[in-house]
C-alpha cells in the first residue's frame, strides 16, 4: 500500500475482474484507513465488524455484507473473532449505488462468496468464471439493504464532537 496525505493508504490495482482476500482476525483488530481502486464486498461469516467512512459507520453482523464503492476511504474494526471474506470487484462489472451500504446475504449469495473465495479470483478469459461474475452482479443488484448505518451529524459542531467520541471509543476506559 502506498501512503498519501491524511494517512490514507491507497492499495494497488488488482489484475483480475474479481479478486478475493480471506482473514481470520482477533477481537478489536483494526484495519487503518485505506482505499481501493476496486469496489469491495466485505462479508463476515463469523463475528461483527464496523466499517467507518467519512459519511458514517456501518455495523456488519454475520450474514450481512458491506458494499464499499471504489475509491472510498474506510477503516474497519472487529468485534469478537472475525472470519472476513472480501471480494474486490472491478468497477466496470458492477453499477451499484455510489454509497456504502450493508446488504442482507441470501444463502445463495453466501455460497457464491465462499465459492469465489475458494477459487481466489475470477479470470477474465475463463467462461465459467464469467458466469460466476454474472451471477454475482445479479445477486448484488437484488440484495436488500439492511438499515445498519450510523450517519455522522451534518452540523459541523456535532460532527466534530462525534468524531472525538469515535476516536476515544476504542480506548481502554470504554472497554469492560
Predicted regions and their residues:
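Linker/hinge segments immediately adjacent to helix-turn-helix/homeobox DNA-binding domains
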Residues: 131-154
Amino acid at each position: 500500500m502506498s501512503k498519501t496525505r491524511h494517512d490514507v493508504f491507497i492499495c494497488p490495482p488488482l489484475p483480475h475482474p474479481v479478486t478475493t482476500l480471506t482473514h481470520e482476525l482477533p477481537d478489536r483488530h483494526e484495519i487503518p484507513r485505506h482505499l481501493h481502486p476496486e469496489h469491495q464486498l466485505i462479508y463476515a461469516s463469523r463475528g461483527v465488524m464496523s466499517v467507518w467512512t467519512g459519511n458514517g459507520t456501518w455495523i456488519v453482523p454475520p450474514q450481512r455484507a458491506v458494499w464499499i464503492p471504489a475509491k472510498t476511504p474506510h477503516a474497519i474494526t472487529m468485534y469478537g473473532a472475525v472470519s472476513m471474506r472480501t471480494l474486490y470487484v472491478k468497477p466496470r462489472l458492477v453499477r451499484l449505488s455510489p454509497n456504502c451500504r450493508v446488504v442482507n446475504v441470501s444463502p445463495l449469495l453466501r455460497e457464491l462468496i465462499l465459492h469465489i473465495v475458494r477459487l481466489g479470483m475470477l479470470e477474465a478469459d475463463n467462461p465459467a468464471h464469467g458466469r460466476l461474475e454474472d451471477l454475482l452482479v445479479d445477486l448484488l443488484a437484488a440484495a436488500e439493504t439492511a438499515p445498519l448505518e450510523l450517519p455522522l451529524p451534518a452540523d459541523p459542531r456535532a460532527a466534530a464532537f462525534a468524531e472525538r467520541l469515535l476516536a476515544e471509543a476504542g480506548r481502554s476506559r470504554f472497554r469492560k
